[in-house]
Curated annotation (Swiss-Prot):
Signal peptide region: none
Disulfide-bond pairs as recorded: none
Catalytic activity line of the entry: XMP + L-glutamine + ATP + H2O = GMP + L-glutamate + AMP + diphosphate + 2 H(+)
Description of how the protein assembles with itself and partners: Homodimer.
Source organism phylogeny: Bacteria, Pseudomonadati, Pseudomonadota, Gammaproteobacteria, Legionellales
Any single GO BP term: GMP biosynthetic process
Protein name in the entry: GMP synthase [glutamine-hydrolyzing]
EC numbers for this chain: 6.3.5.2
Role of this protein: Catalyzes the synthesis of GMP from XMP.
Active site location: C86, H181, E183
GO CC terms, sorted: cytosol
Domain Glutamine amidotransferase type-1 residue range list: 9-207
Residues where ATP binds: S235, G236, G237, V238, D239, S240, A241
């Protein structure tokens, strides 16, 4: 019997926290479906979602100012358990009659939490025990405000040296507040605390498992598509691979895979993709040579958003042409949940569009194909788990992500055949050396970027003006935040040496040492 994987659900209201998506991932890891929505979402949407529990995220603002964000008041009146984290705890306390003040000593980083009442959230959880027998927890703090007076009905359930009210609870109404961040890895017991809220307090059944997600996706595809054919674009990345595999598992020969050779793929990627999918998927694969078409469309275009939208437009037009030849009505896309989040606009401005994702905002409004997106609810790590469960090779599953517009957005400014050729070679050298040195799987994504600027250098006995190549490598779990990879200097020196010696047009190589945020992972 198929499980309803969406039956039990948690709603996360986002107050602009850098950790909001991480909260969602943690809830998914517990085995329960959740969605992330802006904190000012309307009442009808929340009631339609019908959550079993609500989590209020942290945020960068202060509750002490009258114009800052508040939780929708009605969520405290519908009988639903609520967990406030950091800012979420503070706004809950303030809105329910407590007091919040600026603290004389802000807490940023590690703190030791002393549990005063372990009921519900902290039951059976401890890192250490105090001499008085009280449970102690290592937690991660990041706040400049504190709850200075509890709302009616609440009691203090934990404290730190600097925060007498580091956790609070109204057990009767099932409202809980945590001043620390249970979602980050720096709070070792955070996963168990969240599980207590989601499973024990909200009474959610953990049906959100890889096996159940696959079963649900297959059923959904079959119900939507019926006997019609689906066309799926292959890129060599894990998202399109898992999408194609899921669709193939659901409808078999009704799937037609199309690989568009845009001229913007990585070195030798077309041959590699064809080999992998024809060998492992067993589906029909059509390769379309669209290099001239893409170059013509991108000629004279420097704006990154325009390049993304043009790439999306051209992809869809190629697919539509193939679909007409084959009488296909459906387009399968590898859109994943972070694509949806980053491309969403919210009334608060807390979810401003950072960049248009090729799989979301790049689609033309007059698209003739119906869209099916089986991965739309999933984070990248969930997609990888699905791929392994579906039997795709690990080398493909753990291949670094590659953007839909390809090298067009790794070339700053206008794209040209010369720039593409230079970038392909530089990128191939970087990836080859990462694999040879066993660093490839230690980083989450790595690539080269072409800068159409010339820098003076010396080759032989002559001055040489050549282009600049930037190398980018990051480590991340969910691609919502990322840290630049601290690769050994000897390794970077070797890569740089190869690039400037093997690619005559390049005179300088630089390494990008910027985290996300403030930067995005891609340069454009």
């Amino acid at each position: 019997m198929l499980k309803d994987i969406h039956q039990h659900r948690i709603l996360i209201l986002d107050f602009g926290s850098q950790y909001a998506q991480l909260i969602a991932r943690r809830v998914r890891e517990i085995g329960v479906y959740c969605e992330l929505m802006p904190c000012d979402i309307d009442e009808e949407t929340i009631r339609d979602f019908n959550p079993h529990g609500i989590i209020l995220s942290g945020g960068p603002e202060t509750v002490t100012l009258s114009h800052t964000l508040r939780a929708p008041a009605f969520i405290f009146e519908i009988g639903c358990p609520v967990l406030g984290i950091c800012y979420g705890m503070q706004t809950m306390a303030y809105q329910l009659g407590g007091k919040v003040n600026r603290t004389a000593k802000a807490e940023f980083g590690h703190a030791q939490l002393r549990v005063l009442n372990p009921a519900f959230l902290f039951d059976g959880i401890e890192d250490q025990v105090s001499p008085q027998g009280e449970p102690l927890l290592d937690v991660w703090m990041s706040h400049g405000d504190i709850v200075s007076e509890l709302p009616p009905g609440f009691e203090a359930t934990a404290c730190t040296d600097n925060s007498p009210l580091a956790a609070m609870a109204d057990f009767k109404r099932r409202f809980f507040g945590l001043q620390f961040h249970p979602e980050v890895t720096h709070t070792p017991q955070g996963h168990r605390i969240l599980a207590h809220f989601v499973i024990h307090i909200c009474q959610c059944i953990p049906n959100w498992t890889t096996k159940h997600i696959i079963e649900d996706s297959i059923r959904d595809i079959q119900e939507k598509v019926g006997k019609e054919q689906v066309i799926v674009g292959l890129s060599g990345g894990v998202d399109s691979a898992v999408t194609a595999t899921l669709v193939h598992k659901a409808i078999g020969d009704q799937l037609v895979c199309v690989l568009v050779d845009t001229g913007l793929l990585r070195l030798n990627e077309v041959d590699e993709v064809l080999n992998v999918f024809q060998k492992h998927l067993g589906a029909k694969v059509i390769c379309v040579d669209a290099k001239d078409r893409f170059m013509k469309a991108l000629k004279g275009i420097s704006d990154p958003e325009e390049k993304r939208k043009i790439a999306g437009e051209q992809f869809i037009r190629v697919f539509e042409e193939q679909a007409k030849k084959l009488n296909v009505k459906w387009l399968g896309q590898g859109t994943i949940y972070p694509d949806v989040i980053e491309s969403a606009k919210t009334k608060t401005g807390k979810g401003h569009i950072i960049k248009t994702h090729h799989n979301v905002g790049g689609l033309p409004l007059n698209m003739e194909l119906k869209l099916i997106e089986p991965l739309r609810e999933l984070f990248k790590d969930e997609v990888r788990k699905l791929g392994l469960e579906l039997g795709l090779p690990a080398d493909l599953i753990y291949r670094h992500p590659f953007p839909g517009p390809g090298l067009a957005i790794r070339i700053l400014g206008e794209v040209s055949a010369e720039y593409i050729n230079i970038l392909k070679q530089a990128d191939a050298i970087f990836i080859e050396e990462l694999k040879k040195s066993d660093y490839y799987h230690q980083v989450s994504q790595a690539f080269a970027v072409f800068m159409p600027l010339k820098s003076v250098g010396v080759k032989g006995d002559a001055r040489h003006y050549g282009y600049i190549i930037a190398l980018r490598a990051v480590k991340t779990v969910d691609f919502m935040t990322a840290q630049w990879a601290d690769l050994p200097h000897e390794f970077l020196s070797k890569v740089s040496h190869r690039i400037v010696n093997e690619i005559k047009e390049v005179s300088r190589v630089v390494y990008d040492m910027t985290n996300k945020p403030p930067a995005t992972i891609e340069w454009e």
